[in-house]
Amino acid sequence: MLEIGGAASRSLTESQSSFGPTLAVEVTPIEKWLELEIGVTPLFRPHSTEWSVDLLFKKPWTLSDTKEVMIGIGPEWIYSNAYGIKMNSVAGEIVPDFMFWSSKKHRFGWYLEPSYEYKFGPGHEHSIGISGGLLIGIP
């Protein structure tokens, strides 16, 4: 499955917000037990750019033929450039994921994914975010 959408993040440590697009691919190695999602998100704010790549391990639950909910956790690599200072850091992320499909064939739908992130790098930044957008099922 392919996820294409937008993302917003708010640093709880620095009290600043960032916005940008997001793209992720999700596969199901163990039906009804495990889904893996790898995604990339560039976030922008004045004088700062942050690129993140995450790998989430998700447990899915089917609520109906057209609704699913998942909880995921995983590592994240972050490259940031703020005021010319470049930095790499590692973070941990936890996300609930809500999916709504247009039909039970799961070809097209939309998703909403709130998140909490903790950076293990300098400053130990905490942030909350939300992403949402279009789901495209890949047969």
Residue ranges with predicted function:
Residues 5, 20, 72, 89-91, ...:
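Small-side-chain structural scaffolding
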Residues 3, 24, 86-88, 117-119, ...:
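Ser/Thr- (and often Asn-) enriched beta-sheet segments in non-cytosolic proteins
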Residues 1-45, 127, 135-139:
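Short glycine/proline- and aromatic-enriched beta-strand/turn motifs that initiate or cap beta-hairpins
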Residues 15, 33, 94-139:
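Predominantly the C-terminal beta-signal and adjacent terminal strand-loop region
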Residues 24-104, 108:
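Gram-negative (and chloroplast) outer-membrane scaffold detector with strong preference
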Residues 2-10, 38-42, 55, 71-77, ...:
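Transmembrane beta-barrel strands of outer-membrane/channel proteins
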Residues 18, 50-54, 127-131:
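Short hydrophobic/aromatic beta-strand or adjacent loop that forms the aromatic wall/cage
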